[in-house]
């Protein structure tokens, strides 16, 4: 008796043909510009000045936040994470640190204890 299982070899899938950008046509720089051109008003409509919405919002925020007092700074972020004395997973800048190379690690002396997380 011989075992006839499913083959692990799969035929390569046919690739879909995609036209390269040269064949589609040249790119038009006006489609990719960062600045948006303002729409020209029609003859019957008067031209209105458009303000940047972010600039208008800043003016409103200044008046509202003036009477509220100062906001807490980075100290409040540290209070959310109490120190446990074991900071193996995070480095000083909050990013993960790779474990040290075992060849470079010094073995602790008999009288010293090594903290373990």
Curated annotation (Swiss-Prot):
The lineage of its organism: Eukaryota, Metazoa, Chordata, Craniata, Vertebrata. This is G antigen 6. Expressed in a variety of tumor tissues but not in normal tissues, except testis. This gene belongs to a family of genes organized in clustered repeats. They have a high degree of predicted sequence identity, but differ by scattered single nucleotide substitution. Their sequences contain either the antigenic peptide YYWPRPRRY or YRPRPRRY which is recognized by cytotoxic T-cells. Coiled coil: none annotated. InterPro entries: GAGE, GAGE_fam. Residues 1-117 are annotated as: Disordered. It holds the Pfam family GAGE. It comes from Homo sapiens (Human). It comes from the Eukaryota. Residues 32-45, 87-96 have a biased composition (Acidic residues). Belongs to the GAGE family. Residues 103-117 have a biased composition (Basic and acidic residues).
């Amino acid at each position: 008796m011989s075992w006839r299982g499913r083959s692990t070899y799969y035929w390569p899938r046919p690739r879909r043909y995609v036209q390269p950008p040269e064949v589609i046509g040249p790119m038009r720089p006006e489609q990719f510009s960062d600045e948006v051109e303002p729409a020209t008003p029609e003859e019957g409509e008067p031209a209105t000045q458009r303000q940047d919405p972010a600039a208008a919002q800043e003016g409103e925020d200044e008046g509202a936040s003036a009477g509220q007092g100062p906001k807490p700074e980075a100290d409040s972020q540290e209070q959310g994470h109490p120190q446990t004395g074991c900071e193996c997973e995070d480095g000083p800048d909050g990013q993960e640190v790779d474990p040290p190379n075992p060849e470079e690690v010094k073995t602790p002396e008999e009288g010293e204890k090594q903290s373990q997380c």
